[in-house]
Amino acid sequence: MSSSSNPVSQFNNISLGGRISGTRGILKFTTNNITWKSENGKIETVSSSDIKRANWARVTPRIFQLILSIKGGATVKFDGFKEQDYEVVRKYLSDQYNVSPLEIIELSSKGCNWGEVKVNGPMIQFTTDHGKVGFEFPISEVSQSVIGANNKNELTLEFHHDKAMDDDDETMVEMRFFTPIRPSKEGEEGGKEKKVGEDGEEDEEDEEDAEKEEEISALEQFQQTIMNKSDMVSNVGKSLVVFSAIQFLTPRGRIDIEMYPTFLKLHGKTHDYKVPYESISRLFQFFRPDQKHIFFIISLDPPIRQGQTKYAHLVIQFQAEENIHLELNLTDELQQKFKDQLSPIMNGNANALICKILKALTGKKITIPGNFQSDSGANSIKCSLKANEGYLYPLERCFFFVHKPPTYIKFEDISNIEFARYGAPSVRGGSNRTFDLSINLKNSTSIQFVNIQREEYPSLFNFLKEKKLSILNPVTTGPAMIIDDDDSDDDDYEPSESGSESDEGSASDESEEESEEDKKAKKKQKK
């Protein structure tokens, strides 16, 4: 702790208490505010006039926590104080903010893993014996909640990932609560109470089933409270729009999408996910070769988790001709903010509408394929990744394979590319109907796409040469091997409510598009 004369006191190596991750920073007390600034520049400020009460608690043998109760029911905590800091903090709060006393509270330290869990304002609180708090954390930290498919008495909470954390930092990613079935009441003879049915049989099983249903219902209510409170803590109120029963390929299932001003919520049969818009890194839209379905892909950084499985890409499939009617809950402020992008009533193609809304809310451009065409005229090549058949889309600065697993490969990460099983058709017995494509990455891993139709080789070879990707074993014989040096770019998708591609924008400075410097270099080469 470093301290200067009042009215300023400063404490180093302080983290926001009660958070799942513990990014450190500097805490400064000034006349009007308490300000915390993290190592990466994030700032949290508490006005001195908003402080109602202050508590002091030991959280480890050597580390103490300052707990501030704020007007409106919120709680702000700061971890990292030393025992000798108590008197400095107490005196400052009393003299400068007229907040006293700095009450010392005792947390449960017995290590019990059983107790009562409840929602206390914006916090989830776990209490043990004699009502002592074992731990608590903000509901806003919860990214998703899951009731086990095979164990209906278990609720799993997963937490948001803090991008500011280093790779070697530790953070909690998951917590599970188990609700045991309450024992049946004992009868006068010390056994279970027994009910007798109309047929004279004892209905012990019915009683146990009723108790089990009661416990499961309580767990589901607790889960719903968490998700509802999660929205309330974010001060977002009612959702802007809901898309019901949308077909997801990854993760698989029919999922409802609820969109809010700062995040979207995915609600499935067994899982709920909360996805902040700031974690959406890219948006893609690809037509399937049959032109009857559209892939819409939401790339996430960090990915969401389902148990031990991470989903870095959400893959949605729409019918190309599906039209819907939407009514958006836009406040006057939101209407003013998105006046050129969103309107209270929207009609049109389902895919185009969700693209338009997400583009407005996230500020991300939607990348669609450029001018690459396969032998059949499609923007993709049919192939398999491991045992899963799908489509490989060559884009301006990356490859994207849809859909299982969805795989994103940036050109800058590629070391070289190798063709396999491509036999020259002029050699008897040397011709294969399919060939394989191995993409070797700079991190020494390799991704192999197999069972590509040999007719796709010329267009794929030309594309790789145009992008100046290193090919280890090029086959340049044959009449079709002519490099088509056009300045094709992936277009930015400007979704129209009709869903047609006639309103697509031209190339700009999006990361998936070709830079002006690259274009000038190509023109010089042509000259």
Curated annotation (Swiss-Prot):
It comes from the Eukaryota. Pfam families: PH1_SSRP1-like, POB3_N, Rttp106-like_middle, SSrecog. Residues 179-213, 479-527 are annotated as: Disordered. GO terms for biological process: DNA repair; DNA replication; regulation of chromatin organization. The keyword Transport does not apply. The keyword Transcription applies. Residues 183-198 have a biased composition (Basic and acidic residues). Forms a stable heterodimer with spt16. The spt16-ssrp1 dimer associates with a HMG box DNA-binding domain protein, probably nhp6, to form the FACT complex. GO terms for molecular function: DNA binding; histone binding; identical protein binding; nucleosome binding. It comes from Dictyostelium discoideum. It is found in: Nucleus; Chromosome. This is FACT complex subunit SSRP1. InterPro entries: PH-like_dom_sf, RTT106/SPT16-like_middle_dom, RTT106/SSRP1_HistChap/FACT, SSRP1-like_PH1, SSRP1/POB3, SSRP1/POB3_N, SSRP1_DD, SSRP1_sf. Component of the FACT complex, a general chromatin factor that acts to reorganize nucleosomes. The FACT complex is involved in multiple processes that require DNA as a template such as mRNA elongation, DNA replication and DNA repair. During transcription elongation the FACT complex acts as a histone chaperone that both destabilizes and restores nucleosomal structure. Belongs to the SSRP1 family. Residues 199-213, 483-516 have a biased composition (Acidic residues). GO terms for cellular component: FACT complex. Keywords: Chromosome, DNA damage, DNA repair, DNA replication, Nucleus, Transcription, Transcription regulation.
